[in-house]
Amino acid sequence: MKLTIAGDSHGKYMVAILEGLPSGIRVDEELIRRDLFRRRNCYGRGKRMKMEEDAFEIVSGLWKGITTGAPVTILIPNRAGNPVKDVRSVPRPGHIDYAAWVKYKLPDLNIYVERSSARWTVALTAAGSLLKSLLKEFGIEVLGFVTRLGNVEARDIPGDFEELKRRRDESVVFCPDPEATKEMVAEIDRAKEEGNTLGGKVKVIARGVPAGIGSYSDLFKKLDSKIGSLFFAIPAVKGVVIGSEEMWYGFDYLDEFELEDGKIKRKTNNLGGIEGGITNGEDVWVNVSVKPIPTTGKPLKSVDLRTMEPAKTPYVRSDVTAVPPASVVCEAALAVVISDALLEHLGDGNIDDLKRRFENENLPRWNDGFWKEHYR
């Protein structure tokens, strides 16, 4: 499977193209609408998100709502115009401005923002949301939520998946801890008043991923390699940890095996469902660190590249925090990575053929099948 994303932040469209999908997947367009709404409407967003509608259109690859096997193209119009009309020559610390100017040498810092802006994640969100219809065929669900925002950390995170999802959806910052949600809202209000921005952490879970997806032999097909590659492409993502972030002692960290009704299970899931680049049958857990947005309301020290004199950074329309929407984007990103690895494992064709391959795939027996079998 191949995902291509194109479009400028203030151009006519953002575009996502998915190639290599099987035919026969019934696409849930209402789910795509809901995910795009969640990305757009969360606490801490700026003025632009009030202008955008994200009214997507799927212009190829579907027939009567199901995939045909041809490339699926999603168009999302941009409604907001570019608020900066003048040439900008003062780079913002933490943004692409200076580094891109050094490499590409075009004399207007506005140019580089068009690609590096997080606006392109609307296309990633749409693509990942569409792929949830594929994952659903195999009983796989993906869920992202906020675990930290500024100095506020979630303390009461339910272990039950459905309860976690319900609480997440009730929170304006997508945090499943109601008390932490209130504190996060206050933290955002305080940062906005100060002209500051906030970073934080999000967690994404993929439930129902079978054992044996990924690779250990091809370093770049290892599932954790793919997760890191796509997640680090998301603007503001500065850290990706699969599984527990507490990994100091082996006795505490390593997930011991146990048998339960002929099935191999784990007592814990500190490894986050991946060992050596391959899924082990437990839920896949990804922890993501998101930096503060580099456009602050209070000017920072910089240099005017045109005059080479000290200068203050300009204010460009922006959010107070990218953390809540990042939980939606990272959820979509994990859906993309799992879908890609799953299709690599099961092959091409019609979705019913892939499901039969999946259902008929037995786990191996030791020593060419002469010993006891075990089950997924």
UniProtKB/Swiss-Prot annotation:
It holds the Pfam family Chorismate_synt. The keyword Signal does not apply. Its cofactor is FMNH2. GO terms for molecular function: chorismate synthase activity; FMN binding. Gene3D superfamilies: Chorismate synthase AroC (3.60.150.10). Keywords: Amino-acid biosynthesis, Aromatic amino acid biosynthesis, FAD, Flavoprotein, FMN, Lyase, NADP. PROSITE patterns: CHORISMATE_SYNTHASE_1 (PS00787), CHORISMATE_SYNTHASE_2 (PS00788), CHORISMATE_SYNTHASE_3 (PS00789). FMN binds at residues 115-117, 276, 291-295, 317. Reduced FMN (FMNH(2)). GO terms for cellular component: cytosol. It catalyses: 5-O-(1-carboxyvinyl)-3-phosphoshikimate = chorismate + phosphate. Pathway: Metabolic intermediate biosynthesis; chorismate biosynthesis; chorismate from D-erythrose 4-phosphate and phosphoenolpyruvate: step 7/7. GO terms for biological process: amino acid biosynthetic process; aromatic amino acid family biosynthetic process; chorismate biosynthetic process. NADP(+) binds at residues 39, 45. Its EC number is 4.2.3.5. It comes from the Bacteria. This reaction introduces a second double bond into the aromatic ring system. Belongs to the chorismate synthase family. Homotetramer. This is Chorismate synthase. The lineage of its organism: Bacteria, Thermotogati, Thermotogota, Thermotogae, Thermotogales. The gene is aroC.
